[in-house]
Amino acid sequence: MGAADPVRHIPPGERVPGHATPGMVREEAVATGGMWAGFVRTAAHETSGWHHHGDYETSIYVVSGTVRMESGPDGGDVIEAGPGDFFYVPPGAVHREGNPGDEETHLIVVRAGSGPAVVNVDGPAG
């Protein structure tokens, strides 16, 4: 086995602004050729714009707050999750996240795939 790349430490102050979606603040911690990881914040009573993650599979861990995920035909599939819960978003699934609560939500997001990590769209198909 050859020499591996060194282990990296990315403290909060070294995260960089991630891809923009209205209503969300993404902070990129790690981006490699096939993986993206970061921290996402959504303000109280905000809802993100509709988007998908191209060819990426996405795993979302809710650190704090309440998250309302809308997806499916006309956005009619709705899931609410809280601290300790995970979401799985398959490649190409159009969705948006909302924060119905009174406190900012904090999420850890990890994506595996290639191509654009965020594609903003007008809305889901009917």
Language model segments and positions:
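A short, N-terminal "cap"/entry segment at the start of jelly-roll beta-barrel domains
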Residues: 1-39, 118-126
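Conserved short histidine dyad/triad with adjacent acidic residue
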Residues: 21-22, 38-54, 91
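Short strand-connecting beta-turns/loops that link adjacent beta-strands
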Residues: 33-34, 55, 74, 102-103
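Residue-level recognition of conserved beta-strand positions in structured domain cores
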Residues: 39, 52, 71-73, 99, ...
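Short, conserved beta-strand element in jelly-roll/cupin
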Residues: 41-43, 54-69, 110
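Histidine-centered metal-chelating micro-motifs
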Residues: 47-49, 68, 87, 91-97
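A short hydrophobic beta-strand segment most commonly corresponding to one strand
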Residues: 59, 88, 103-119
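Short acidic-glycine-tyrosine-enriched beta hairpin
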Residues: 75-91
